[in-house]
UniProtKB/Swiss-Prot annotation:
Keywords: Acetylation, DNA-binding, Isopeptide bond, Metal-binding, Nucleus, Phosphoprotein, Transcription, Transcription regulation, Ubl conjugation, Zinc, Zinc-finger. One of its GO terms (biological process) is regulation of embryonic development. GO terms for molecular function: DNA binding; histone binding; histone reader activity; lysine-acetylated histone binding; methylated histone binding; zinc ion binding. It comes from the Eukaryota. Residues 96-116, 142-153, 613-622 have a biased composition (Basic and acidic residues). Zn(2+) 2 binds at residues 845, 848, 870, 874. PROSITE patterns: HTH_MYB, ZF_ZZ_1, ZF_ZZ_2. The lineage of its organism: Eukaryota, Metazoa, Chordata, Craniata, Vertebrata. A zinc finger (ZZ-type) spans 825-884. It comes from Mus musculus. This is ZZ-type zinc finger-containing protein 3. Zn(2+) 1 binds at residues 830, 833, 857, 860. Residues 41-117, 133-153, 303-358, 373-444, 609-641 are annotated as: Disordered.
């Protein structure tokens, strides 16, 4: 049988590849790297390559279809039966009525087209005739791509083998269940006439020497093949020989040795079954998808040069030519292509598979892709497969990295794979795309394939495709680990800016913080839209309140926005960033006692003193209005991080009120308990009683608070309800503090120690006018004079008479100052004599309205001047000092208060 293969191989031109070294009678040592650059060709059959046409994946010419008249009727019957009677798994749903009608329509069109086509007398090599006949064919008659024909060739062999009565094929059926359950069931059918063990060994050696990996040898060494005397169809050389005889004369004698007895097309191939991608499978998918989109000449040139050119050049050119390809493609064009595939099954019967093993693998992929699109026609969605730059760079740097497949269990696992499984892997990987869950069919599909079907593919596989082991099917554990690693590599954290420092770009805490900020900004935008929506619904409800109430009673959907779960800030371990003391911390290291009093002014708004921690137990009935972002990239045990409360670490051993400020209510209750529980010999017992009474503070916290409280009372001169502390210890310490600075007083929360102590307020209730018109020094003198008089005498009439004398004294002093000095009341005019400005004493009418009041000079104050508003009996008030315009912006502020708007404010002088 080997000699027959050799004689047939010598009779036709071919390229010498790893798969044809044994067939051409060459030595095994010839299989080196120089093998790719050598060829054995006969001058009578050398054909020149035509020019590469435009890259249009949808409009391509088709060769004149040829047909074998002897097999026309039989093939159409078999094809119609296969389209209707596909084997259905008991766990999958049957095809819908629309899908069945579509398949029947395709079958009828194929019958009509085959009857209308004549059968040529001579069968030529279609692969070489395509280029010559492409220009003579019209696009209306040939909407299908010519590179679909190798897939059709297998169907012809199936039809030939269907009539063979002497041999039965062994079929392995892969039942691919629902997409959610990745289960593979194997159904083995017994086979008559197993292989001879010697022939199996020889074929395995050929495949190994010719560059086909061990996984391809599993085609022969599978459990379906039983070694005995029948050599049947498993010899690769005889397979090719029989293939040529079928293509040449179409006699039924060669049908006994045809190896492709598969009913592969009879079942609906499920291209949507999810498959876990490994690195090898991803590269195979990228290469196939790119090849499917190339023009016919370019694709044939690539497949022809794959045996002679380096693998790395082909792979890099494919990846460079297409970085983004359309996976599904145009649904209408694919539909026509699939119909043409089913209508012309005999066209490819005249095409001979090359002995050198240069398969039209890309054509097969196109055919399978067209079938996939026709099955998914109700959902015409387009998806784009974007090649990851990292993956592309990896492929360019090491293109031959995957020449040998990944192994988990060694040769045992590879030999357990049947050729059916290898074909299944090919079909799944070709059609695999990022589809929607809704696009995945819910019914399981069945793939029935002959055990010897892949023998010729293993032989006819070029080196460029041999680098990707098609027969490799990784285990679930290996696939899951590779898939997880790929997700981690291809989906890095992108929450950083390009201008950030390198240390920040790869910092998980920084990325998590930016992610939280991004989510919060989105939630804020949504909240603004929700507020606008609420305002709109409010206006509509006010226009029709009765209808609005009726909708509420009927519980109808009004369209009100739903509340959001606000994302909380992530927990960050600040200890890893603040382990070493900086200059700022060294400077204020000795002032640590003041850190407990530090509180910003915006905390008075009502925010809790202690931030809500996710570690706090949730109360019953508490609405979960906050949510945390997932911490998938964080280290394990991140939820056990200790919490920081006001600069101090808090763990489970600390009380709930650890390092929290005392409220005003707690302080008042503490003062009451200090009076309730008198001092004891052992003060710790007193603190424990007070702590038990408070309920939320420990004895240690009470002792610390009472100590500070007593010091405050002692400094203020207020009696201490207990032992008086020694102020000498505390007075020795430096009193300079950031809190005492007048510029920092607004940054600190007022103390709660002296809440019950109310300082006295002194106010002159008899004469409010004196406070308005008198100088600040005069007001201070009056206050000091009144303080010298005891309170018990202030209600006597003598005290009131004394106050009147004081006022008269002040007026006389002011008059004397006015007469001795020259005073001009700028802006005031005498309403009687008309002198302007009034000099000396100005008399102002108190009874007239302020906007219409009259002013007189000192000489006209006694004249009986009357107007419509001013009467003679009105009371006049003397004004001794001129009221000039005073610009407060140029006055130095009194006291310790300040304003940044004051131009005279200089913080350096304070």
């Amino acid at each position: 049988m080997v000699g027959t293969c050799h004689s047939m191989a010598a009779s036709r031109s071919t390229r010498v590849t790893r798969s044809t070294v044994g067939l051409n009678g060459l030595d095994e040592s010839f299989c080196g790297r120089t093998l790719r650059n050598r060829s054995i060709a006969h001058p009578e059959e050398i054909s020149s390559h035509s020019q590469v046409r435009s890259r249009s994946p949808k409009k391509r010419a088709e060769p004149v279809p040829t047909q074998k008249g002897t097999n026309n009727g039989r093939t159409s019957d078999v094809r119609q039966q296969s389209a209707r009677d596909s084997w259905v798994s008991p766990r999958k749903r049957r095809l819908s009525s629309s899908e069945k009608d579509d398949l029947e329509r395709q079958a009828l069109e194929s019958c009509e087209r085959r009857q209308a086509e004549p059968a040529p007398p001579v069968f030529k090599n279609i692969k070489r005739c395509l280029r010559a006949e492409a220009t003579n064919s019209s696009e209306e008659d040939s909407p299908v791509k010519p590179d679909k024909e190798p897939g059709e060739h297998r169907r012809i062999v199936v039809d030939h083998d269907a009539d063979f009565q002497g041999a039965k094929r062994a079929c392995r059926c892969l039942i691919l269940d629902d997409c959610e359950k990745r289960e593979v069931k194997k159904v083995n059918v017994s086979e008559e006439g197993p292989l001879n063990a010697a022939v199996v060994e020889e074929i395995t050696g050929y495949l190994t020497v010719n560059g086909v990996d061990d996984s391809d040898s599993a085609v022969i060494n599978c459990d379906d093949c039983q070694p005995d005397g029948n050599t049947k169809q498993n010899n690769p050389g005889s397979c090719v020989l029989q293939e040529e005889s079928v293509a040449g004369d179409g006699d039924s004698e060669t049908q006994t040795s045809v190896f492709c007895g598969s009913r592969k097309e009879d079942s609906c191939i499920d291209h949507f079954v999810p498959c876990t991608k490994s690195d090898v499978q991803v590269k195979l998918e990228d290469h196939k998808l790119v090849t499917a989109c190339l023009p016919v000449e370019r694709r044939n040139q690539l497949t022809a040069e794959s045996a002679s050119g380096p693998v790395s050049e082909i792979q890099s050119s494919l990846r460079d030519s297409e970085e983004e390809v359309d996976v599904v493609g145009d649904s209408s064009a694919s539909k026509e292509q699939c119909n043409e595939n089913s209508s012309n099954p005999l066209d490819t019967g005249s095409e001979r598979m090359p002995v050198s093993g240069e398969p039209e693998l890309s054509s097969i992929l196109d055919c399978v892709s067209a079938q996939m699109t026709s099955l998914s026609e109700p959902q015409e969605h387009r998806y784009t497969l974007r090649t990851s730059p990292r993956r592309a760079a990896l492929a360019r740097s090491s293109p031959t990295k995957t020449t040998s497949p990944y192994r988990e269990n060694g040769q045992l696992e590879e030999t357990n794979l049947s050729p059916q499984e290898t074909n299944t892997t090919v079909s799944d990987h070709v059609s695999e795309s990022p589809t929607d869950p809704a696009e995945v069919p819910q019914d399981g599909k069945v793939l029935c394939c002959d055990s010897e079907n892949y023998g010729s593919e293993g032989l006819s596989k070029p080196p460029s495709e041999a680098r990707v082991n098609i027969g490799h099917l990784p285990s679930a554990k290996e696939s899951a680990s590779q898939h997880t690693a790929e997700e981690e590599d291809d989906d890095p954290d992108v929450y950083y800016f390009e201008s950030d420092h390198v240390a920040l770009k790869h910092n998980k805490d920084y990325q998590r913080l930016l992610q939280t900020i991004a989510v919060l900004e989105a939630q804020r935008s949504q909240a603004v839209q929700d507020l606008e929506s609420l305002g709109k619904h409010q206006r509509e409800a006010l226009k029709n309140p009765i209808g609005f109430v009726e909708k509420l009673q009927k519980k109808a959907d009004i369209g009100l926005p739903y509340p959001q779960r606000v994302v909380q800030l992530p927990e960050i371990m600040w200890d890893q960033y603040t382990n070493s003391l900086g200059n700022f911390e060294r400077e204020f290291k000795h002032r640590k006692r003041h850190t407990r009093r530090v509180k910003l002014v915006f905390d008075k708004v009502g925010l809790p003193a202690r931030p809500k921690s996710p570690l706090d137990p949730k109360k019953d009935g508490e609405s979960l209005s906050y949510s945390m972002l997932p911490l998938s990239d964080g280290p394990e045990g991140s939820h056990n991080r200790p919490q920081m409360i006001r600069g101090r670490l808090c763990d489970d051993s600390k009380p709930e009120t650890f390092n929290q400020l005392w409220t005003v209510e707690e302080q008042k209750k503490l003062e009451q308990l200090l009076l309730k529980y008198p001092p004891e010999e052992v003060e710790s017992r007193r603190w424990q009683k007070i702590a038990d009474e408070l309920g939320n503070r420990t004895a240690k916290q009470v002792a610390s608070r009472v100590q500070k409280y007593f010091i405050k009372l002692t400094k203020a001169g207020i009696p201490v309800p207990g032992r008086t502390p020694n102020l000498y210890i505390y007075s020795r310490k430096s009193s300079t503090s950031r809190r005492q600075h007048p510029l920092n007083k607004h940054l600190f929360k007022p103390s709660t120690f002296m809440t019950s102590h109310e300082p006295p307020v002194y106010m002159d209730e008899d004469d409010d006018r004196s406070c308005l018109h008198s100088h600040m020094s005069t007001a201070a003198e009056e206050a000091s004079d009144e303080e010298s008089i005891p309170i018990i005498y202030r209600s006597l009439p003598e005290y009131k008479e004394l106050l009147q004398f004081k006022k008269l004294k002040k007026q006389k002093l002011q008059q004397m100052q006015a007469e001795s000095g020259f005073v001009q009341h700028v802006g005031f005019k005498c309403d009687n004599c008309g002198v302007e400005p009034i000099q000396g004493v100005r008399w102002h009418c108190q009874d007239c309205p302020p906007e219409m009041s009259l002013d007189f000079c000192d000489s006209c104050s006694d004249c009986p001047h009357e107007t419509d508003i001013h009467k003679e009996d009105h009371q006049l008030e003397p004004v001794y000092k001129s009221e000039t315009f005073l610009d407060r912006d140029y006055c130095v502020s009194q006291g310790t208060s300040y304003s940044y708007l004051d131009p005279n404010y200089f913080p350096a002088n304070r």
